Amino acid sequence: MFTRAVSRLSRKRPPSDIHDGDGSSSSGHQSLKSTAKWASSLENLLEDPEGVKRFREFLKKEFSEENVLFWLACEDFKKTEDKKQMQEKAKKIYMTFLSNKASSQVNVEGQSRLTEKILEEPHPLMFQKLQDQIFNLMKYDSYSRFLKSDLFLKHRRTEEEEEDPPDAQTAAKRASRIYNT
């Protein structure tokens, strides 16, 4: 089931949607109640560019942004068809996230089995097991904390305020209380 969800994610979103320079959505305005979608599953959060942006902000504060960056890089890698590009991306993923000298090393089992020699013959699912480990780490650790974080709750409140502005009667009652005191 998990692999199908990840595969579904791979097909739905082109790489450019998740790799905007600032991580923001190209539409500039998100659908109503996106936080409700984000809260329903990590998959839904990762399908939404604004959700990815907020999750990255949270993970950066937790010093674990490399997890979502690795996951996103693997999603992009799986969509690569050109063998030369695939080889270049595989080496970049390895050097950035998996090697002992990685600048943003992720903590996964089995990374030592991936050697530069294996990277010379890459295939789209070569990082799948490691990506699944990181997904599960995020799902059962970071994601639940994100949903309780000030960053998420503030975004949800802002979204609710934009959707449900106080009606005129409520505003009039507030005004009368202010001026009658």
From Swiss-Prot:
Functional summary from the UniProt entry: Regulates G protein-coupled receptor signaling cascades, including signaling downstream of the muscarinic acetylcholine receptor CHRM2. Inhibits signal transduction by increasing the GTPase activity of G protein alpha subunits, thereby driving them into their inactive GDP-bound form. Modulates the activity of potassium channels that are activated in response to CHRM2 signaling. Activity on GNAZ is inhibited by palmitoylation of the G-protein.
GO BP field: G protein-coupled acetylcholine receptor signaling pathway; negative regulation of signal transduction; positive regulation of GTPase activity; regulation of G protein-coupled receptor signaling pathway; response to amphetamine
Coarse class of the protein's main subcellular location: cytoplasm
Name this protein carries in UniProt: Regulator of G-protein signaling 10
Localization per Swiss-Prot or TrEMBL: Cytoplasm, Cytosol; Nucleus
UniProt KW Lipoprotein keyword: yes
An example Gene Ontology CC term for this record: axon terminus
Quaternary data: Interacts with GNAZ, GNAI1 and GNAI3. Associates specifically with the activated, GTP-bound forms of GNAZ and GNAI3.
Keywords: Cytoplasm, GTPase activation, Lipoprotein, Nucleus, Palmitate, Phosphoprotein, Signal transduction inhibitor
Domain RGS: residue ranges: 41-156
PANTHER family: REGULATOR OF G-PROTEIN SIGNALING LOCO
Residues bearing the modification Phosphoserine: 24, 41, 176
Lipid linkage positions (S-palmitoyl cysteine): 74
Pfam families xrefs: RGS (PF00615)
GO molecular function: G-protein alpha-subunit binding; GTPase activator activity
Region Disordered: start-end pairs: 1-35, 157-181
